[in-house]
Curated annotation (Swiss-Prot):
One of its GO terms (molecular function) is large ribosomal subunit rRNA binding. SUPFAM superfamilies: Ribosomal protein L14. GO terms for cellular component: cytosolic large ribosomal subunit. PROSITE patterns: RIBOSOMAL_L14. This is Large ribosomal subunit protein uL14. InterPro entries: Ribosomal_uL14, Ribosomal_uL14_bac-type, Ribosomal_uL14_CS, Ribosomal_uL14_sf.
Length: 123
């Protein structure tokens, strides 16, 4: 579960290393976000000469959480870290051209098929 001020790893090659959630999108009183939800983030640390720089405010989709996600068959998939993929604000496509680490199948149901196709492993 991701809430405001949560620090996330960035799982793409857009140049950002860490991002902080500043708003959970989808309703005025919504507090928490899970895998597949879109959030508003600010870049906290970035590499030099990258597509994004520190302080940029972007949208991101959550791809991994420590809390995990429960499947219909009863299994729970948990990860070691909280991670997101930065999105282009206009067309909701990923900013980077590569995705690092595994992602879950639930992103397909949230219409992020491009992230699924770029990911090295889909659980």
């Amino acid at each position: 579960m991701i809430q405001e001020r949560t620090i996330l790893n960035v799982a793409d090659n857009s140049g950002a290393r860490f991002a902080m959630c500043i708003k959970v999108l989808g309703g005025s009183k919504r507090r928490y976000a899970n895998i597949g939800d879109v959030i508003k983030v600010t870049v906290k640390e970035a590499i030099p000469k990258a597509k994004v720089k520190k302080g940029d405010v972007l949208q991101a989709v959550i791809v991994r959480t420590k809390k995990g996600i429960r499947r219909i068959d009863g299994s729970i998939i948990r990860f070691d870290n909280n991670a997101c993929v930065l999105l282009n604000d206009t067309n909701m496509q990923p900013l980077g051209t590569r995705i690092f680490g595994p992602v879950t199948r639930e992103l397909r149901y949230a219409n992020f098929v491009r992230i699924i196709s770029l990911a090295p492993e889909v659980l």
